[in-house]
Amino acid sequence: MKAFPAGFLWGGAIAANQVEGAWQEDGKGPSTSDMQPNGVFGELVERKEGDSALKDVAIDFYHRYPEDVALFAEMGFNCLRISIAWTRIFPNGDESTPNEAGLAFYDDLFDELAGHGITPLVTLSHYEMPWGLVKEYGGWGSRETIRCFEHYARTVFSRYQNKVKLWLTFNEINMSLHAPMTGVGLPNSSSKAEVYQAIHHQLVASALAVKACHEIIPDAKIGNMLLGGLMYPLSCKPEDVFETLQQNRSWAFFGDVQCRGAYPGYMLRYFRDNGIEIEITDADREALRTTVDFISFSYYMSGCVTADEALNEQLRGNILSMVPNPHLPSSEWGWQIDPLGLRTLLNMMWDRWQKPLFIVENGLGAKDHVEADGSIHDDYRIAYMNDHLLQMREAIEDGVEMLGYTSWGPIDLVSASKAEISKRYGFIYVDREDDGSGTLARSRKKSFFWYRDVIASNGANLE
């Protein structure tokens, strides 16, 4: 089979709050993720001394990263997506001087990656922000958080300008509509007007970070990151088709702002029709004109949309409130598996924005069984990924420009949605259970060797 383009980036993606642990070490402050010990849809819990959560240790990447990076290198990674924990750098979020211990940790991590020939792709904010900014200012509901984020971004750009040339601003920025506390630091009960105002502040902050990156690291590239939720009409009824258009716009509008530099007309109408008034200043409009260099996104599933509200209420099942597609199988967690949908989405994004695309999350969460000899035969994961990578290559043949692919969770980690480790994505098994038991020992699954061979052939061995 045909190989992927020369220079294609292969690797995996992790997030600080799902792997690092060490949640109170070396001056780190509490984040919104720390206050959501049961996941992004769980209740908010202000932590007390002596309590514990799975993410407090996670997989202890903070102390074990040399071992993990060596395993990534053994698979042939030439790229690793990570996130910086904002609260390691500014524990409360509004300090003027950064925490040197936090900066030093990422210095060491980037040096370790460089020693193995692995390019870092760094997310500035991945499903967390300083809890101090939530308590003091109301999270992204306040313009003060824009200032704090820009200061944080400029600090890390300056510190790592010789070590990191690929950046992302906010992880799955459109998830704020579904999980406001995780996305913008607002209570999940917040009104649409409050959430969209906070999202506006975040979009402005993202654009200011892009501008700062271009100023401080002229040879760097910086992108956005979307949750790619492909939706099909449940039927060919015109009402279902139009409702699907509207639902796809609900996430694509973030990309429209970040790629085109202004709010699209359909979103301004949505605000008018729903009585939502967003404070947008002339300075905001000027800031938004700075657009991203590339588009990154996650892709796990697709679903269907219907204009029939009663049917929608009866059938919808996953985090994007889509209804199941009767033509697709589902994972153990109810996420519908649709490899061809990835090709469709890649083409849609390329046609819409004409910017290079980077798949920075994709994978199968499943319960893995450890055999008596310690082996793990995760053929289901291999099949899932093989089918998606084949469709990705078809999209490239369609003319889509792609930078790379980083699978989600190349090593088992604590899931974002429900803060459980039993939902495993990794090629590398971590001996830890949802109750916190286990040795944290690492071992290679069957998929480890499969992905190693895919990377070694630059995708030519896919079948």
How does the language model describe each region?
Residues 1-49, 73, 92-94, 103-463:
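Active-site region of glycoside hydrolase catalytic domains
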Residues 50-64, 141-143:
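Active-site mouth loops of central-metabolism enzymes
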Residues 60, 64-85, 290, 294:
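Catalytic domains of carbohydrate-active enzymes, especially glycoside hydrolases
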Residues 84-98:
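Glycine-rich, proline-tolerant flexible connector loops at the mouths of alpha/beta enzymes
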